[in-house]
Curated annotation (Swiss-Prot):
Cofactor: Mg(2+)
Sequence positions that bind Mg(2+) 3: 483, 487, 491
Catalytic activity from the UniProt record: (2E)-geranyl diphosphate + H2O = (S)-alpha-terpineol + diphosphate
Ligand binding (Mg(2+) 2): 339, 343
Organism: Vitis vinifera (Grape)
Domain comment, as recorded: The Asp-Asp-Xaa-Xaa-Asp/Glu (DDXXD/E) motif is important for the catalytic activity, presumably through binding to Mg(2+).
A biological process from GO: diterpenoid biosynthetic process
InterPro entries, per database record: Isoprenoid_synthase_dom_sf, Terpene_cyclase-like_1_C, Terpene_cyclase_plant_C1, Terpene_synth_N, Terpene_synth_N_sf, Terpene_synthase-like, Terpene_synthase_metal-bd, Terpenoid_cyclase/PrenylTrfase
Pathway recorded for this protein: Secondary metabolite biosynthesis; terpenoid biosynthesis
Cofactor binding summary note: Binds 3 Mg(2+) ions per subunit.
Protein name in the entry: (-)-alpha-terpineol synthase
Length: 590
């Protein structure tokens, strides 16, 4: 089938100019080419390369190095500790289960839950142990039932969908009277995104809540509730980047009638102090990036240090994980450069050489590489070995084999896509996906992340890591499909392989609109798998599972309004400013 498809290609990509190699007997230089001397002959080979015309970074070195926060020092540390001591007793004083759940929900959405993980776990354990008693506090209360369901599932407790059966009528449909409870409907909608495969009740709940929440917005409902409903319908809470959600929710919470001023002050101060930590990480990485000179030497590629750092903040923002953010930023930045080598600049012969060198992981094998690839490989080799050296010091483990395998697999997947491009081959959707969940770089990111946060490192986890456990696969799949929704048209214009949308159109004859709907459907189905594998007993620590989930969330954040990684303006610029540059205005009581 693959061979038969080589002869045909959709009109969508036939206009793309292919990179070509011209052997010039007259030895004239092409203004679009690079002249390379061929042996001792008088002729030169002119390699005409593609260009993606990426815009230079808007975040220059001097600007990044100038970022400073006022929220550092002993005064703020003492104030934060005092607020933390004030908040902790709240978790012990609330006794009613619904009050406990509401407090936990607020702490999570404000982004300060990580200070109280043990207390939250103790409360949820108590609630779960009483779960099957069907106490009066939740009976016939859609809001309470949905909130309990969402929080327990989010924290890995096995809660059945049947808990919502009592809200159905004799026909099996959700009761019409529920539509009057907009707060409960919103909570039901958010809870439905914690579903796993085969849960028809949760699918039914999502459709029911979505439909009636949309109608509710047309009515005169509470303004603050309407803001939360619009926000949820745009993207559900379970799919949102936690740090960005915290920044949004702090503003929303400040306007609520039930706002607790101690919680609000704590959330604002913690956000600003953590932002100061992120700025320190960012300045450190800016110095590293400048020292590599890759942005200068490989000017065909995207210079996206800030965006790559933003990814790491989205994946793991807590202040104690600075080393993870810094090393992950190196990984992300190298991925971006190498991706552009394969997608934009390299010839087929060069790409095959580079893939072989990465697979062999031998600096003595890189002599045949062109100079730009030597720089690229050495940066990759040195950064990876630096991380492996740190792991050897800290854990006594030799992890190079795991890291190099991940990079080798990535480059091989890039090479396959390059072969598809040069042969003008459009794969089936399944064939595309079976390769592209690796080429999106999720496995590389997550394999490195495991070694950056896991302690201890277990044999079972290493085995699961090597064969790419499902939690890695599903997270990477969501990353791939979200990327395709946001970038496919731009990438086709600059001469990339067809993405999932075009593969589905070519295979089925569907319209672009229908293909996009199908891709969105696949994202939803993959989230169900990720929910399931994130909740079952796992060889991985909770922190790593959170990273895998957050990588999927970050993908939907970055590609929600287009190519948020490659295009720096608009939403991405606003997010960088709100998360990494601008502190939240202080309360007058600070």
């Amino acid at each position: 089938m693959a061979l038969s498809m080589l002869s045909s290609i959709p009109n969508l990509i036939t206009h793309t100019r292919l990179p070509i190699i011209i052997k010039s007997s007259s030895c004239k230089a092409s203004p679009r080419g690079i002249k390379v001397k061929i042996g001792n002959s008088n002729c030169e080979e002119i390699i005409v390369r593609r260009t993606a015309n990426y815009h230079p970074t808007i975040w220059d070195y001097d600007y990044v190095q100038s970022l400073r926060s006022d929220y550092v020092g002993e005064t703020y540390t003492r104030r934060l500790d005092k607020l933390k001591r004030d908040v902790k007793p709240m978790l012990g004083k609330v006794k009613k289960p619904l009050d406990q759940l509401e407090l936990i929900d607020v702490l999570q959405r404000l982004g300060i839950y990580y200070h109280f993980k043990d207390e939250i776990k103790r409360i949820l354990n108590g609630i779960y142990n009483q779960y099957n008693r069907h106490e009066e506090w939740q009976k016939d209360d859609l809001y309470a039932t949905a909130l309990e369901f969402r929080l327990l599932r989010q924290h890995g407790y096995d809660v059945p969908q049947d808990v919502f059966s009592r809200f159905k009528d004799d026909t099996g449909s959700f009761k019409a009277c529920l539509c009057e409870d907009m707060k409960g409907m919103l909570c039901l909608y958010e809870a439905s995104y914690l579903c796993v495969q085969g849960e028809s009740t949760m699918e039914q709940a999502r459709d029911f809540a979505h439909r009636h929440l949309g109608k509710g917005l047309e009515q005169n409902i509470d303004q603050n509730l309407a803001i939360e409903v619009k926000h949820a319908l745009e993207l559900p809470l379970h799919w949102r980047m936690p740090r960005l959600e915290a920044r949004w929710f702090i503003d929303v919470y400040e306007k609520r009638q039930d706002m607790n001023p101690i919680l609000l002050e704590f959330a604002k101060l913690d956000f600003n102090m953590v932002q100061a930590t992120h700025q320190e990480d960012l300045r450190h990485m800016s110095s590293w990036w400048s020292s590599t000179r890759l942005g200068e030497k490989l000017n065909f590629a995207r210079d996206r240090l800030m965006e790559n750092f933003l990814w790491t903040v989205g994946v793991i923002f807590e202040p104690q994980y600075g080393y993870c953010r810094r090393m992950s930023t190196k990984v992300n930045t190298l991925i971006t450069i190498i991706d552009d080598v394969y997608d934009v600049y390299g010839t087929m012969d060069e790409l095959e050489l580079f893939t072989d060198v990465v697979d062999r992981w031998d600096i003595n094998a890189m002599d045949p590489l062109p100079e730009y690839m030597k720089l690229c490989f050495l940066a990759l080799y040195n950064s990876t070995n630096e991380m492996a050296y740190d792991a050897l010091k800290e854990h006594g483990l030799h992890i190079v084999s795991y890291l190099r395998k991940a990079w080798s697999d990535l480059c091989k997947s890039y090479l396959l896509e390059a072969k598809w491009y040069y042969s003008r081959y459009t794969p089936s959707l399944q064939e595309y996906i079976s390769n592209s969940w690796i080429s999106i770089s999720g496995p590389v990111i997550l394999v490195h992340a495991y070694f950056l946060v896991a302690n201890p490192i277990t044999k079972e986890a290493l085995q699961s890591l090597e064969r790419y456990h499902n939690i890695i696969r599903w997270s990477s799949m969501i990353l791939r499909l979200s990327d395709d929704l946001g970038t496919s048209l731009d990438e086709l214009k600059r001469g990339d392989v067809p993405k999932s949308i075009q593969c589905y159109m070519y295979e089925t004859g569907a319209s672009e609109e229908d293909a996009r709907k199908h891709t969105s459907y696949l994202i939803g189905e993959t989230w169900k798998k990720l929910n399931e594998d994130g909740a079952v007993e796992s060889p991985f620590p909770e922190t790593f599972i959170g990273i895998a989930m957050n990588l999927a969330r970050m993908a939907q954040c970055m590609y929600q309004h287009g190519d948020g990684h490659g295009i720096e303006y608009g939403e991405t610029e606003d997010r960088v400013l709100s998360l990494l540059v601008e502190p939240i205005p202080s309360l007058s009581s600070e």
